[in-house]
Amino acid sequence: MMSSKGNEVHGMRKIILRIAGSAVMAAAILCGAQVSCAQRVGPDTIALFPKNIGEFAYANLKQARAEKWFPQLQEQMLPERFKQFEKFLASAGVDPNSQVEELAWGLIAEGVTAKTEGTGSTAVPTGEEIVGVALGNYNPNSTEAYFKAQKLPSFKSHGFTMYAFGTGTGPSDLFFLFLDSNTAAFGHRSELEQMLDVRYGGAEGLLRNERMYSLINEANGSGVVWAVLNPAYTRLAMQQLAPQVQQFPEAAKLVTRMQNLILNIQASSGIDGKFQAICGSVDDANTLAQLMTLAFAYQQYQAKQQNPDLANLLGQATVNPAGDRVVLRLALTDDQMTTLIKKNTFALKM
């Protein structure tokens, strides 16, 4: 019978695999990009987002599309709602592949409160809404004229017209509007309206969320792809990836004390995917690092038979505690990426 310690490691290995998958999927689109090309998201863009964002992410799609095998990964890694957004724009004559250059989006959790979303709680999101901006070059007048001619459902807010992806009445329907010729916003209606409230000073924005904004500033500009998660989304990630971990009191307590997750990708002649788990203490970080190291070794052993290329990748991963953080790094070559993509290694549902 497996000991509780062994079960903890078994549960943690699933977390590590998902972490590895997340980092690799993001890293995969960046081979050939240069570190010097990594762009910072301007504070004016970050300032558009509501204060209660639980997850904030960024991708430089212009650089990603320069990679020859990006189309193969696009179906696996891009958010489903962004795919809907691309199709929606294409119907109006907008070419997302040439006109949409950067994407930033945020998730707003349902099922948690301002009190329960922080550390020390077991509450996790039970649903979510999305709001995002696509930065690029647009012709708002011609696009909006097309939407009007098609008689798409629309709503006015703060002088802007929001166009519905679907009927405009469903709870999951997404909307779209142009903020200017370089910025298109998309998301659920309530969140878009909140974004406009923030824009015009009627509500507090993400700049007022000191913890998230501090970590966003840390991640911003350090990679072509990066993301920051708050405590509630951190717990949800752990719960979804390794439900067994909640069965063990000490491991479960460690999860409730976790503060944030940060992912960023740097690229030069190769790829360096960096994932940081911010723990509740130095001791927690040391414990988590030990479990992650064991989990990688175990998964590497399991993968040798079915996917030796993945096993090699896991063998190259490094896990180290750094104060109250655990830092995971994954380094990949072009050849490794090509082989792993062919084997559909990155087909993970995020």
Question: Which residue ranges define each predicted feature?
Answer:
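Gly/Pro-enriched, hydrophobic low-complexity segments
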Residues: 202-205, 265-306
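One face of beta-strands
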Residues: 57, 132, 259-263, 269-277, ...
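A conserved glycine-rich beta-strand in the N-terminal activation segment of trypsin-fold
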Residues: 172-237
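Solvent-exposed coil/turn segments that connect beta secondary-structure elements
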Residues: 61-62, 108, 135-139, 168, ...
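N-terminal secretory signal peptides that target proteins for export/translocation
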Residues: 1-17
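Bacterial N-terminal signal peptides
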Residues: 20-32
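Structural boundary/hinge residues at secondary-structure and domain interfaces
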Residues: 37-165, 169-171, 216-253, 288-316, ...
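A short, solvent-exposed beta-edge/loop patch
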Residues: 57, 170-200, 270, 318-337
